[in-house]
């Protein structure tokens, strides 16, 4: 009786806990913008803020003068009370580029572009176990097909993809542009990247991850895994750019900047956690990693002998920024959170679902990526993906800030004073976590309290019976 009670009660409790941290009823930024523009007071403040951001870019208009800066700050403070300030986007949504443009226009700092860049995407809060429950595991599928040889999981995953209409459709859609030669080039890289993004956005994770994160025991399998994204077109180039230059290029594009911020947020390592991930969620890390594929920051396996990944870049010609460059590159290459997530998927395992993930207490700075604060002249306009200003600050996410500060109140962002002053940013630019989008409430909802109470009572009755 006791085990039966747990069997039915624990999934319900896990579902409710996931709902508690999902962010509530936040609007996507497109809907929030439309809603704001219909309200006179919100519309006025929103237009003022957009003029402030545009003016700051060109050192013109409202951005000049103390009075103008006060007006800009007033507009931002007023918008904090609106749904627009707390809006998010969904990866692969119909108007994703427009949504991200609105999001970043809201989160541009007017005092040095140093706002903490949390992920612009609505949290998914999924689990690898959720993916495994969708259909039988890949090896189980092929137990029903006698003529298919066993042993190469990546080959099995590719064949499983061909048996699924959606996976087959989108895989064919990227194979064609990624392998077709165009004039003197190997392929049309732009079309290849777009098709790859659609593949990982549209195809169920069961199949796309099966090809990208399959577990291997031999070189033939690992090489097939490395070739999944057709790296000769989507990944490799004649020369490797400097990683910091590649990062700058990524930050000028709404999609790339957002996917990179999402990766830093969801794959942040933490050695004291059960999974080596700060957020204790392998599925979210793998989703964030796959989201980078099809951008200029496309990562891939470095070779066929390890799970180390990296973008196509190195740290040559870094000059005084060598340490910063290596920190950025090693976030990919030596990321224990990502490696554990890949291994967990390949093994069909997951972070212990029912174990409560208590915050890791630490007073030391959380390892973060080398995200440079730098203002650059604007490039030519015309692309809907282009971003006017492109800055990624040292913190990867709000949760890292909480771990560093050991509190959940109004603390300054986790930017070390040395790095902050080195970049020439004044102390007045500091903001508090309270000024950011409000984090999910840590309090239990009445519904959850009721369920927990009922569960406790039920368990007590089963023990006494």
UniProtKB/Swiss-Prot annotation:
Sequence repeats mapped onto the chain: 25-113, 150-238, 239-342
Signal peptide residue numbers: 1-24
Localization (cell): Cell membrane; Golgi apparatus, trans-Golgi network; Endosome; Endosome, Multivesicular body
One GO location term (cellular component): multivesicular body
Propeptide feature: residues: 430-465
Keyword Glycoprotein recorded: yes
Oligomeric and partner information: Interacts with GDNF ligand and RET: forms a 2:2:2 ternary complex composed of GDNF ligand, GFRA1 and RET receptor. Interacts with SORL1, either alone or in complex with GDNF. Interaction between SORL1 and GFRA1 leads to GFRA1 internalization, but not degradation.
Family the UniProt entry places it in: Belongs to the GDNFR family.
Protein name as catalogued: GDNF family receptor alpha-1
Natural source organism: Homo sapiens
Gene giving rise to this polypeptide: GFRA1
């Amino acid at each position: 009786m006791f085990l039966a009670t747990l069997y039915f009660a624990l999934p319900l409790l896990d579902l409710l806990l996931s709902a508690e941290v999902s962010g509530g009823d936040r609007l996507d930024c497109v809907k929030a913008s439309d809603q704001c523009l219909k309200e006179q007071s919100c519309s006025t403040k929103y237009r003022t803020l957009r003029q402030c951001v545009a003016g700051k870019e060109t050192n013109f208009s409202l951005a000049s003068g103390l009075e103008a800066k006060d007006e800009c700050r007033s507009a931002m403070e007023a918008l904090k009370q609106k749904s627009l300030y707390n809006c998010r986007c969904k990866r692969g949504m119909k108007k994703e580029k427009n949504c991200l443009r609105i999001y970043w226009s809201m989160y541009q700092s007017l005092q040095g572009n140093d706002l903490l860049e949390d992920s612009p995407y609505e949290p998914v809060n999924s689990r690898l176990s959720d993916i495994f429950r969708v259909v039988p595991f890949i090896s189980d599928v092929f137990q029903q097909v006698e003529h298919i040889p066993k042993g190469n999981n990546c080959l099995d995953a590719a064949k499983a993809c061909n048996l699924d209409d959606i996976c087959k459709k989108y895989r064919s859609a990227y194979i064609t542009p990624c392998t077709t030669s165009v004039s003197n080039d190997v392929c049309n890289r732009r079309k290849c990247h777009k098709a790859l993004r659609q593949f990982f956005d549209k195809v169920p994770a069961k199949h796309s991850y099966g090809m990208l994160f399959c577990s291997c025991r031999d070189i033939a399998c690992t090489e097939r895994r490395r070739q999944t994204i057709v790296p000769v077109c989507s990944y490799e180039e004649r020369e490797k750019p400097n990683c910091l230059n590649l990062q700058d290029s990524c930050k000028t594009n709404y999609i790339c900047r957002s996917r990179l911020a999402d990766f830093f947020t969801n794959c942040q390592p933490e050695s004291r956690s059960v999974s080596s991930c700060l957020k204790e969620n392998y599925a979210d890390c793998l989703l964030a990693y796959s989201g980078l594929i099809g951008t200029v920051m496309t990562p891939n396996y470095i070779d066929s002998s390890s799970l180390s990944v990296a973008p196509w870049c190195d740290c040559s010609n870094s000059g005084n920024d060598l340490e910063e460059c290596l920190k950025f590159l090693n976030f990919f290459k030596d990321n224990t959170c990502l490696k554990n997530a890949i291994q967990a998927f390949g093994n069909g395992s997951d972070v212990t679902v029912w174990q409560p993930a208590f915050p890791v207490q630490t007073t030391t700075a959380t390892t973060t990526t080398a995200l440079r604060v730098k203002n650059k002249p604007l490039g030519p306009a015309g692309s809907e993906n282009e971003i006017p200003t492109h800055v990624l600050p040292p913190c990867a996410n709000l949760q890292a800030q909480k771990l560093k500060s050991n509190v959940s109140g109004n603390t300054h962002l986790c930017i070390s004073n040395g790095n902050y002053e080195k970049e020439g940013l004044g102390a007045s630019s500091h903001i508090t976590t309270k000024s950011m989008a409000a984090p999910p409430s840590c309090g239990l909802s009445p519904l959850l309290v009721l369920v927990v109470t009922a569960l406790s009572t039920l368990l007590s009755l089963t023990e006494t019976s």
